[in-house]
Design a protein with these regions (language model features):
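A short beta-strand-turn-helix
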Residues: 10-27, 52
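Structural microenvironment flanking redox-active thiols in thiol-disulfide oxidoreductases
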Residues: 51-112
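Short active-site neighborhood of thiol/selenol oxidoreductases, capturing the structured segment around
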Residues: 23-37, 60
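Typically the conserved alpha-helix immediately C-terminal to a functionally engaged Cys/Sec
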Residues: 33, 39-54
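Extracytoplasmic
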Residues: 24-26, 55-57, 63, 148-150
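Solvent-exposed loop/turn segments at secondary-structure junctions
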Residues: 35-38, 66-70, 98-102, 128-131, ...
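C-terminal cap of thioredoxin/glutaredoxin-like
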Residues: 49, 110-239
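Short coil-to-helix leader/linker segments, especially the first N-terminal amphipathic alpha-helix
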Residues: 1-13
Length: 239
């Protein structure tokens, strides 16, 4: 299950979790993942594919959740964010999961070079102290909502930990989309549906408060147009 190039737009904000699919989609899937986790590797293709199944209706965000039991996971998370700063997160994501034996510092740099990244910039970026704060923030959401293992998924706030099958994952997203469409039919604005559903799914007030601050109230710039399509609102000099 590989994504179809250009069918789903990728986000461009280097300071937010990388995403596939439009901001304001009625279903938001947050993937809480660890690059050294073997089960996360099995789920990685599904992460890429699910927005392709429901284009325009589903947004996937990749949140870092490196587990302490995996010694190379945090370094890989930092490296992936450094690749994101050069607009290559998803390519780098694919390479890290393709070969989990190359997650040591030298292997991470070698992967960056193979993808054509500016390695000097990559090394500076992955050493930036603010990356740890971001990773800790993303992991805090996982821990607070009960995702102590990986992979974990928040489908409009509803938590599922572990990986069963592609059909099970797709079915869960499809069922949530049905519920989201019911809200839209009642007049709830399309871009408010994911938050409304998450608030209903997250019962603990403290957990909802953290989710709201990190996810709902965080700036959500629109995704870039799919490959081959130009955004008429932006000039060629826009970011």
């Amino acid at each position: 299950m590989r994504t179809v190039s250009g069918k789903v737009a990728a986000s461009t904000d280097p300071d937010r979790p990388p995403a596939l699919g439009p901001a304001g989609a009625p279903v938001l899937v947050i993937v809480l993942s660890d690059f050294q986790c073997p089960v996360c590797r099995r789920a990685a293709d599904a992460t890429r594919q699910i927005p392709e199944e429901f284009p325009g209706d589903v947004r996937v965000e990749f949140w870092q959740h490196p587990l302490a039991m995996h010694p190379n996971a945090r370094g890989a998370a930092r490296a992936a964010i450094a690749a994101q700063r050069q607009g290559r997160f998803w390519d780098y994501h694919d390479e890290l999961f393709r070969d989990q034996s190359a997650l040591d510092p030298a292997g991470l740099a070698s992967t960056a070079a193979r993808l054509g990244l500016d390695v000097a910039r990559f090394d500076r970026d992955r050493a930036a102290p603010e990356l740890d704060a971001r990773i800790d923030r993303e992991s805090a959401l996982a821990e607070t909502l009960g995702a102590r293992g990986t992979p974990a998924f928040l489908v409009n706030g509803a938590l599922a930990v572990g990986w069963g099958s592609w059909s099970g994952f797709r079915g869960a997203v499809e069922r949530e989309l049905i519920e989201a469409r019911k809200l839209i039919e009642t007049g709830v604005p399309r871009d408010a549906v994911a938050a409304r559903r998450a608030e209903a799914a997250i019962k603990d007030p403290g957990s909802w408060s953290l989710y709201r601050s990190l996810v709902v109230d965080a700036p959500q710039p629109p995704a870039a147009p799919p490959a081959g399509k130009k955004d008429p609102k932006k000039s060629k000099h826009s970011r």
